[in-house]
Protein backbone atom coordinates (compact mmCIF):
# COMPACT_ATOMS: atom_id res chain seq x y z
CA UNK A 1 0.00 0.00 0.00
CA UNK A 2 2.76 2.45 0.92
CA UNK A 3 4.50 1.94 -2.44
CA UNK A 4 1.25 2.56 -4.28
CA UNK A 5 0.48 5.65 -2.22
CA UNK A 6 3.97 7.08 -2.72
CA UNK A 7 3.69 6.68 -6.47
CA UNK A 8 0.11 7.94 -6.62
CA UNK A 9 -0.74 10.64 -9.09
CA UNK A 10 -3.99 12.62 -9.23
CA UNK A 11 -6.83 10.24 -10.11
CA UNK A 12 -7.47 9.76 -13.80
CA UNK A 13 -10.85 10.32 -15.41
CA UNK A 14 -12.22 6.92 -16.39
CA UNK A 15 -15.12 6.77 -18.87
CA UNK A 16 -18.23 4.94 -17.68
CA UNK A 17 -18.31 2.72 -20.78
CA UNK A 18 -14.78 1.53 -19.95
CA UNK A 19 -15.86 0.58 -16.42
CA UNK A 20 -18.95 -1.19 -17.75
CA UNK A 21 -16.81 -3.24 -20.14
CA UNK A 22 -14.12 -4.05 -17.54
CA UNK A 23 -16.69 -5.27 -14.99
CA UNK A 24 -18.77 -7.18 -17.55
CA UNK A 25 -21.64 -4.74 -17.07
CA UNK A 26 -21.19 -4.64 -13.29
CA UNK A 27 -21.90 -8.37 -13.24
CA UNK A 28 -22.76 -10.12 -10.01
CA UNK A 29 -19.89 -12.54 -10.73
CA UNK A 30 -17.44 -9.62 -10.40
CA UNK A 31 -18.95 -8.18 -7.21
CA UNK A 32 -16.56 -8.47 -4.26
CA UNK A 33 -18.32 -6.31 -1.71
CA UNK A 34 -21.10 -3.95 -0.78
CA UNK A 35 -21.28 -1.07 1.67
CA UNK A 36 -22.94 2.22 2.45
CA UNK A 37 -21.61 3.94 -0.69
CA UNK A 38 -22.54 1.12 -3.03
CA UNK A 39 -21.13 -2.03 -4.53
CA UNK A 40 -17.52 -2.96 -5.25
CA UNK A 41 -16.52 -4.87 -8.38
CA UNK A 42 -13.16 -6.26 -9.43
CA UNK A 43 -11.53 -5.90 -12.81
CA UNK A 44 -8.11 -6.79 -14.14
CA UNK A 45 -7.38 -3.91 -16.51
CA UNK A 46 -8.62 -0.45 -17.43
CA UNK A 47 -7.23 1.21 -20.57
CA UNK A 48 -7.31 4.65 -18.90
CA UNK A 49 -5.04 3.54 -16.04
CA UNK A 50 -1.57 2.00 -15.80
CA UNK A 51 -1.80 -1.72 -15.16
CA UNK A 52 -1.34 -2.78 -11.54
CA UNK A 53 -0.49 -6.35 -10.55
CA UNK A 54 -3.30 -6.58 -8.01
CA UNK A 55 -6.11 -5.46 -10.35
CA UNK A 56 -8.69 -2.79 -9.60
CA UNK A 57 -11.62 -2.33 -7.25
CA UNK A 58 -14.43 -0.24 -8.75
CA UNK A 59 -16.74 1.28 -6.11
CA UNK A 60 -20.08 2.30 -7.58
CA UNK A 61 -22.79 4.48 -6.08
CA UNK A 62 -26.02 2.63 -5.35
CA UNK A 63 -28.09 5.28 -7.11
CA UNK A 64 -27.54 7.98 -9.69
CA UNK A 65 -25.92 11.16 -8.42
CA UNK A 66 -27.94 14.39 -8.50
CA UNK A 67 -26.42 17.87 -8.65
CA UNK A 68 -25.87 18.10 -4.87
CA UNK A 69 -24.54 14.54 -4.69
CA UNK A 70 -22.15 15.25 -7.56
CA UNK A 71 -20.81 18.36 -5.78
CA UNK A 72 -20.32 16.35 -2.56
CA UNK A 73 -18.58 13.56 -4.48
CA UNK A 74 -16.27 16.05 -6.21
CA UNK A 75 -15.34 17.44 -2.79
CA UNK A 76 -14.66 13.93 -1.50
CA UNK A 77 -12.53 13.16 -4.57
CA UNK A 78 -10.44 16.30 -3.91
CA UNK A 79 -9.89 15.19 -0.30
CA UNK A 80 -9.04 11.61 -1.25
CA UNK A 81 -6.72 12.81 -4.02
CA UNK A 82 -4.71 14.85 -1.52
CA UNK A 83 -4.51 12.02 1.01
CA UNK A 84 -1.27 10.07 1.32
CA UNK A 85 -1.18 7.76 4.32
CA UNK A 86 0.31 4.29 4.68
CA UNK A 87 -3.06 2.83 5.71
CA UNK A 88 -5.11 4.37 2.89
CA UNK A 89 -5.32 3.03 -0.62
CA UNK A 90 -4.67 5.66 -3.27
CA UNK A 91 -7.59 6.80 -5.41
CA UNK A 92 -6.49 5.85 -8.94
CA UNK A 93 -9.46 6.88 -11.04
CA UNK A 94 -12.88 8.50 -10.97
CA UNK A 95 -15.99 8.50 -13.09
CA UNK A 96 -18.42 11.27 -12.21
CA UNK A 97 -21.13 10.31 -14.69
CA UNK A 98 -24.57 11.35 -13.38
CA UNK A 99 -25.90 7.90 -14.28
CA UNK A 100 -23.30 6.12 -12.15
CA UNK A 101 -20.46 7.62 -10.15
CA UNK A 102 -17.47 5.34 -9.57
CA UNK A 103 -14.20 5.44 -7.65
CA UNK A 104 -11.30 3.19 -8.70
CA UNK A 105 -8.75 1.85 -6.21
CA UNK A 106 -6.15 -0.92 -6.27
CA UNK A 107 -7.82 -4.23 -5.41
CA UNK A 108 -6.96 -5.66 -1.98
CA UNK A 109 -6.58 -9.34 -2.74
CA UNK A 110 -6.71 -10.23 0.97
CA UNK A 111 -10.43 -9.52 1.21
CA UNK A 112 -12.34 -7.11 3.38
CA UNK A 113 -11.88 -6.75 7.11
CA UNK A 114 -15.46 -7.88 7.63
CA UNK A 115 -14.80 -11.08 5.67
CA UNK A 116 -11.62 -11.75 7.67
CA UNK A 117 -13.52 -11.33 10.95
CA UNK A 118 -16.83 -13.05 10.12
CA UNK A 119 -16.41 -16.17 8.02
CA UNK A 120 -19.90 -16.33 6.55
CA UNK A 121 -20.83 -18.35 3.45
CA UNK A 122 -20.95 -15.06 1.50
CA UNK A 123 -17.42 -14.23 2.72
CA UNK A 124 -16.16 -17.62 1.54
CA UNK A 125 -17.70 -16.96 -1.88
CA UNK A 126 -15.98 -13.54 -2.08
CA UNK A 127 -12.63 -15.13 -1.14
CA UNK A 128 -13.06 -17.60 -4.01
CA UNK A 129 -13.73 -14.67 -6.37
CA UNK A 130 -10.43 -13.16 -5.20
CA UNK A 131 -8.59 -16.37 -6.10
CA UNK A 132 -8.51 -18.26 -2.78
CA UNK A 133 -9.25 -22.00 -2.77
CA UNK A 134 -10.12 -21.75 0.92
CA UNK A 135 -10.59 -18.78 3.21
CA UNK A 136 -7.43 -17.37 4.78
CA UNK A 137 -7.00 -18.03 8.49
CA UNK A 138 -8.79 -15.74 10.94
CA UNK A 139 -6.88 -12.66 12.06
CA UNK A 140 -4.87 -13.17 15.25
CA UNK A 141 -5.43 -10.89 18.23
CA UNK A 142 -2.17 -9.08 17.42
CA UNK A 143 -3.26 -8.56 13.80
CA UNK A 144 -6.64 -7.23 14.94
CA UNK A 145 -4.91 -4.72 17.21
CA UNK A 146 -2.67 -3.60 14.31
CA UNK A 147 -5.74 -3.12 12.10
CA UNK A 148 -7.41 -1.10 14.86
CA UNK A 149 -4.31 1.08 15.36
CA UNK A 150 -3.82 1.62 11.61
CA UNK A 151 -7.50 2.44 11.02
CA UNK A 152 -7.48 4.94 13.89
CA UNK A 153 -4.32 6.53 12.49
CA UNK A 154 -5.87 6.82 9.02
CA UNK A 155 -9.11 8.30 10.39
CA UNK A 156 -7.17 10.84 12.45
CA UNK A 157 -5.16 11.75 9.35
CA UNK A 158 -8.30 12.23 7.22
CA UNK A 159 -10.02 14.35 9.87
CA UNK A 160 -7.01 16.63 10.30
CA UNK A 161 -6.18 16.93 6.59
CA UNK A 162 -6.44 20.55 5.50
Q: Could you say what each language-model-derived stretch is?
A:
Residues 7-29:
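A short, low-complexity linker immediately N-terminal to eukaryotic Hanks-type protein kinase catalytic domains
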Residues 29-40:
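Protein kinase glycine-rich loop
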Residues 35, 83-86:
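Conserved N-lobe motifs of Hanks-type protein kinase catalytic domains
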Residues 41-64:
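Glycine-rich ATP phosphate-binding loop
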Residues 73-78:
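Regulatory alphaC helix of protein kinase catalytic domains
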Residues 90-101, 109-110:
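Short beta-strand micro-motifs within the conserved protein kinase catalytic domain, predominantly
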Residues 108-129:
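Structural motif in protein kinase domains
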Residues 153-162:
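Protein kinase catalytic-loop region centered on the HRD/HxD motif
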Amino acid sequence: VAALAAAAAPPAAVPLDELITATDGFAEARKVGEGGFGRVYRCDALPSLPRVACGFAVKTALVGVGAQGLAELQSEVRTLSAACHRSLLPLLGVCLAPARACLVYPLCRGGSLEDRLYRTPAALQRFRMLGFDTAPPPLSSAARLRVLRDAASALHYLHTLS
